[in-house]
């Protein structure tokens, strides 16, 4: 009754020390995107990509889209300024952090009253743009998100990252000896 499931525990470690795949840091994911102030928007890349991941994300995307900084009230700007990269913005809400260039991203969530600052930019005093959220999730720059900021945040927060979906699909294909289920 029910299903029996087992897996090779070594299969879990696919990235990082001791593997052939390196982690993608925040800097490697979004460090080439133009710096913005609250409410600003950019449509052009200002520098070339400097990581393999950035090159892959930019493929087939001649223009930059969805790179508009959220507007913030003064108290939010003050809170972000006071927070060191890698630290939580609030003691009560540990999932709202200011990202650090050298770290990995925590899970993005879709809900919340103030969606613009679940994750604050490591250097700029603002929340992430939709393009930055997409990049971190492995959506290429030619991927179009529709709707306003909140709707786009819900889409990125609820999404399965494309590179994760690909890895799962390849694992299923490999485990089933190429037979699709």
List where the protein language model places each region.
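Low-complexity, glycine/alanine/valine/leucine- and proline-rich hydrophobic stretches
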Residues: 122-141
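Class I S-adenosyl-L-methionine
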Residues: 1-89
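Internal helical hairpin/lid segments
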Residues: 69-118
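Generic C-terminus detector
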Residues: 148-181
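Short, surface-exposed loop/helix-turn segments at secondary-structure junctions
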Residues: 118-125, 157
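Active-site and glycan-interaction determinants of carbohydrate-active enzymes
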Residues: 143-147
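Hydrophobic, well-ordered secondary-structure elements that form the walls
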Residues: 108, 129, 136, 157, ...
